[in-house]
């Protein structure tokens, strides 16, 4: 009269739990600097790319900060990003063409299973733009009159561009100076510009007018982000009547 207990266990007697580590995050911040002009909020646009694909687009804050959103990682691995500025349409701005490379290495602690993201930023994290100031230049010609005294405003002269368009019309002063106004050149006008200065033929009886077409060349060059204008005047800058 003895009882006997027989246990029947399942084939699997082990409870298996899976630990899923919490995602880790990484965030990048760059700066924008503008020289020659006050920086304003949202003036410039920046892109964050991974594998050549744009994943975020941001604009600068008023203080120049460029803050990208945090990126989450739920597994180990290495990630490479590029940050670049989107070139704008303002021809008076020299935009920074830097491609800043950021790497993120995500590792997992063997004991705790916790993920950690290590961010490696480039040495240069500042995008530098330059507002290129226009350059101005001017020149004078002279008028000489033989046979009598020259009067103020007596003769008229025109400054024409290479297409023959009249840009300025001026008269001489009593001393014979023909003073033209400033010519202004912007960042988009680097190069060579040609002009002519001509006397407008009058109708005074007995007056012999000078038919000279004086050629003027202005060469606009750029040293870094500074414009320079160089005038090349003809050997003869005097109109003789």
Where are the regions a protein language model picked out?
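Solvent-exposed loop/turn and edge beta-strand elements of beta-rich ligand-binding domains
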Residues: 1-241
